Structure formats: C-alpha cells, structure tokens
C-alpha cells in the first residue's frame, strides 16, 4: 500500500543584513524574478511575498528589507520596522548571510530571530566566490560554536546551487495543509507595484555610485489593453541637482532607464509595454514619515 506524502504549506521570513542576496534567493526559489536586485545596499525597501509551489508543498517567502543598526533616518526606521514585522505569523525563518564573513548586523538578525522561538535556517550565500569550498570552514566553525540553527545551507542563489536540499528542509518545517495560493501565482504584489520596482531597479543600476539615496518611483498610470500595457512612472528625488543626474546629458540616462525597465516588464508581464518616465522633485521626502507612507513605505 502506497503511503501518501502529506502536502505542506506555510510562511517563511527571509531575514538578513543588507546586500547578502535575500532577493536573489527569493527569486531563485520562486523560479522567476519578482524582487529587484542590484549591488547597492537597501535595494529591497518593501515587504513582498514570493510564492514557491512544488509537488510536495507551497513555501510562501516573505522577502524583507535588510536589517541594519543605523536607524536615525526615517526611511531606515520604516524598513527595519517592516523587516521586524515580517516575523509575525510565520512558521520559520531563513537567515541569509554571505560566505565571506559574519558581522554585527548578522548577530543583530540572529538575536532578533532567536527571540521568536521559531525554527531558523541559516543560508550562507555566494559560495560561488570560492573555488575551494574548504575556505568556508573558518566561517562554519565560528557559526557552529556561537549559534544554533535548525539546518545550515551553503548555497549560490545566483548560480542556483544547493537549493534542492534547502527546499526539502524548508518544506519539512512547514505544517500540513492546503496551499494558500493557486499554482500559477508567484507574488501577492500587484503588477503596478512590480512595474514601479523595475523602474527603481534600473535607476539604481544606471546611476551606480551617483545614485541619490532618496530616490523612489511612483506609478502615475497603468492601463491594460489587449496585447499592450501603458505605464507612466514618476521618479522622485529631493534636489534639482539630483534630477539632472537622473535625466543625464540630453536625457540619455533617463532614456536608458526607460528602455531597460520596459524590457524587464515585457519579460515579466509577457506582453508589450509602452512606458513613459519623468523625474520630479519633492524636497526632503525621505525625512518625512507622512511622505514616506504616501510612497508606500509601511
């Protein structure tokens, strides 16, 4: 008699310091890009659910902003609050760090998770940086001597290495139950939100070190017609000088932002996209909690 394996479903928070690859890991587990990524810290600013569905179960990943000690800036406070709030009503947590080192912000995240009493799985990301995996031994020794985890997984989210065992262990931590979302759903966020994030991703990528910290994107309009989405995106900065940086000489940089963002949207939405972009100034919006909330910061 064949024994049926019970279906499992639950929520898992993805926690860690900035720039360790939390969103890349979420995208890899979901199987498609739903969270934007860049080399800049604090790329992720909002909570987002990534829905990873497998024959054995469904993992609902709660991708979060990076935890950090600096909380003087209102935007940082709100992002820390969002990350901490993601621990409500989850069945387990993924603590993501990187293969090169463990620092004080990793300890901050560990202590936060340890206080919840939920199972915590450690993911050591970016192992593709090492040809000789024995180079990880000092870090693993330090972690094992000072911290306790349900399981530890060295992975490369970018190269999709080590994910099968991780998925198996995550499913084992979840309760038995029916899926929360249908099989074809990949996130709880709207296409409008995803469009704004894809524009912001390109702002970060195209500006690099010139990027003003206080840059955000608001969708002015989003209309769906058969075979075509029409989208208007406002890129907000705090100074006229920052506006000039985003636009670039003769509008070249803004044009490149629009072209690359449109290509990403067409790939995600599976339809043609007409995208317009503008840059506007709202002085000191990132220091005003009321203004932050109008831009969707929770």
Curated annotation (Swiss-Prot):
List residues of the Era-type G domain: 8-176
Q: Does the keyword Manganese apply?
A: no
Q: Where is this region: G4?
A: 125-128
Instruction: Kindly list the places in or outside the cell where this protein is found, as annotated in its UniProt entry.
Output: Cytoplasm; Cell inner membrane
Question: Is Cytoplasm tagged as a keyword?
Answer: yes
**UniProt family annotation:** Belongs to the TRAFAC class TrmE-Era-EngA-EngB-Septin-like GTPase superfamily. Era GTPase family.
Q: Please state what the protein is called.
A: GTPase Era
| UniProt organism field | Xylella fastidiosa (strain M12)
Gene name? era
């Amino acid at each position: 008699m064949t024994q049926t394996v019970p279906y499992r479903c639950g929520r898992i928070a993805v926690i860690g310091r900035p720039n360790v690859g939390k969103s890349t890991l979420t995208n890899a587990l979901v199987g498609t890009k739903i969270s934007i990524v860049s080399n800049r810290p604090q790329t992720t600013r909002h909570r987002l659910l990534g829905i990873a569905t497998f024959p054995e179960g469904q993992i609902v990943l709660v991708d979060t902003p990076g935890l950090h000690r600096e909380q003087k800036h209102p935007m940082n406070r709100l992002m820390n609050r969002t990350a901490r709030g993601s621990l409500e009503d989850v069945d387990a947590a993924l603590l993501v760090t990187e293969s090169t080192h463990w620092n004080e912000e990793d300890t901050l995240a560990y202590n936060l998770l340890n206080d919840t009493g939920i199972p915590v799985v450690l993911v050591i990301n970016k192992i593709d940086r090492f040809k000789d995996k024995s180079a990880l031994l000092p870090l693993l020794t330090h972690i094992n001597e000072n911290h306790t985890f349900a399981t530890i997984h060295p992975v490369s989210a970018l190269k999709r290495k080590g994910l099968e065992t991780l998925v198996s262990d995550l499913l084992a931590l979840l309760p038995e139950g029916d899926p929360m979302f249908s099989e074809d759903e990949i996130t709880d966020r709207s296409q409008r939100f995803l469009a704004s994030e894809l524009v912001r991703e390109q702002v970060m990528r195209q500006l690099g070190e010139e990027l003003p910290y206080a840059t955000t994107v608001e969708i002015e309009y989003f209309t769906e017609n058969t075979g075509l989405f029409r989208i208007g995106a406002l890129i907000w900065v705090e100074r006229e000088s920052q506006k000039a940086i985003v636009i670039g000489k003769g509008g070249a940089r803004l044009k490149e932002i629009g072209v690359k963002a449109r290509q990403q949207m067409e790939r995600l939405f599976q339809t043609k996209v007409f995208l317009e972009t503008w840059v506007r100034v709202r002085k000191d919006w990132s220091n005003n909690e009321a203004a932050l909330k109008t831009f969707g910061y929770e």
